[in-house]
């Protein structure tokens, strides 16, 4: 079987699984960096559509200020510990992404706030009216979908699965 056929089969099998996994998650973890290069890990509820991932966060929060000065962010959605078969290999989807602020008076703001309202309820009406809350778009670039040990797949921002990562594996330490 040639590489392209393998790639198409892998895409057909994993794309629905990735979409289902993402839809089951309501929050994502954010790894941001401040102007001095200090890392910060946090989380935020999110929605996702063809434009990217979106988080509505307060300027008071450290991660929002970090995104303003350094738009490079890493995001992760991860399987709940109670659902994991193995804690050392929890299912997860991660992306390197670039953040940009969505203007309040834009059509995109209105669309995404409505989408958030459908997903999270009336709290979005209140939060979106607060001056310190900002809507960030997180545009995914390269990512990784990990299903377990030896099951890691490179994923592009538009969920295209790359077969290449399957060739790498764990190796024991040699006692030489």
Curated annotation (Swiss-Prot):
Q: Which effect does the record note for changing residue 27 to V?
A: 2-fold decrease in the amount of liberated Fe(2+)
Site (Important for activity) found at: 132
- Tell me which positions the record assigns to the signal sequence: none
Q: How is its activity regulated?
A: Activity is pH-dependent. A proximal hydrogen bond between Asp-132 and the heme axial ligant His-170 is essential for heme degradation activity. Heme-degradation reaction is inhibited by iron chelators.
Positions of heme binding: 170
Mind telling me which Gene3D superfamilies this protein's record contains? Electron Transport, Fmn-binding Protein, Chain A
Q: Could you cite one Gene Ontology molecular function of this protein?
A: coenzyme F420 binding
For the null mutant, the annotation states: Mutant is defective in heme utilization.
Which reaction is this enzyme known to catalyze? Answer: heme b + 3 AH2 + 3 O2 + 2 H(+) = biliverdin IXbeta + CO + Fe(2+) + 3 A + 3 H2O; heme b + 3 AH2 + 3 O2 + 3 H(+) = biliverdin IXdelta + CO + Fe(2+) + 3 A + 3 H2O
The broad enzyme category this protein falls into is oxidoreductase
Matching InterPro entries? F420H2_bilvrd_red/Heme_oxyg (IPR052019), HutZ (IPR014419), Pyridox_Oxase_N (IPR011576), Split_barrel_FMN-bd (IPR012349)
Q: What induces it?
A: Negatively regulated by iron.
- Outcome recorded upon mutating residue 170 to A: Can still bind heme. Retains heme degradation activity, but it eliminates pH-dependent activation. Cannot bind heme
The EC designation for this entry is 1.14.99.58
Write the record's keywords in alphabetical order, separated by commas. Answer: Heme, Iron, Metal-binding, Oxidoreductase
- Output the Pfam families linked to this UniProt entry: PNPOx_N
Task: Outline the subunit composition.
Answer: Homodimer. Interacts with HutX, leading to the transfer of the heme from HutX to apo-HutZ.
Q: What does this protein do?
A: Involved in heme degradation. Catalyzes the degradation of heme to biliverdin, with the release of iron. Forms biliverdin beta and delta. Binds heme with high efficiency.
**Family according to the record:** Belongs to the heme oxygenase HugZ/HutZ family.
Q: Matching PANTHER family, A to Z?
A: HEME OXYGENASE HI_0854-RELATED (PTHR35176:SF6)
Output the NCBIfam families linked to this UniProt entry.
heme_HutZ (TIGR04110)
- Name the UniProt record assigns to this protein: Heme oxygenase HutZ
Can you name the source organism?
Answer: Vibrio cholerae serotype O1 (strain ATCC 39315 / El Tor Inaba N16961)
């Amino acid at each position: 079987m040639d590489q392209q056929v393998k790639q198409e089969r892998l895409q057909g099998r994993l794309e629905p699984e990735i979409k289902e996994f993402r839809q089951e998650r309501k929050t994502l973890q954010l790894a941001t960096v401040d102007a001095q290069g200090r890392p910060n890990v946090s989380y935020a509820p999110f929605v996702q559509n063809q434009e990217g991932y979106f988080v509505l966060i307060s300027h008071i929060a450290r991660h929002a200020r970090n995104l303003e000065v350094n738009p490079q962010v890493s995001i992760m959605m991860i399987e709940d510990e109670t659902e994991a078969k193995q804690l050392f290999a929890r299912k997860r989807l991660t992306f390197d992404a670039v953040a940009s602020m969505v203007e309040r008076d834009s059509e995109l703001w209105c669309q995404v706030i409505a989408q958030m309202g459908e997903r999270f309820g009336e709290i979005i009406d209140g939060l979106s009216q607060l001056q310190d809350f900002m809507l960030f778009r997180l545009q995914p670039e390269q990512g990784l979908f990990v299903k377990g040990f030896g099951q890691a797949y490179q994923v592009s921002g538009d969920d295209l699965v790359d077969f290449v990562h399957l060739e790498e594996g764990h190796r024991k330490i040699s006692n030489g």
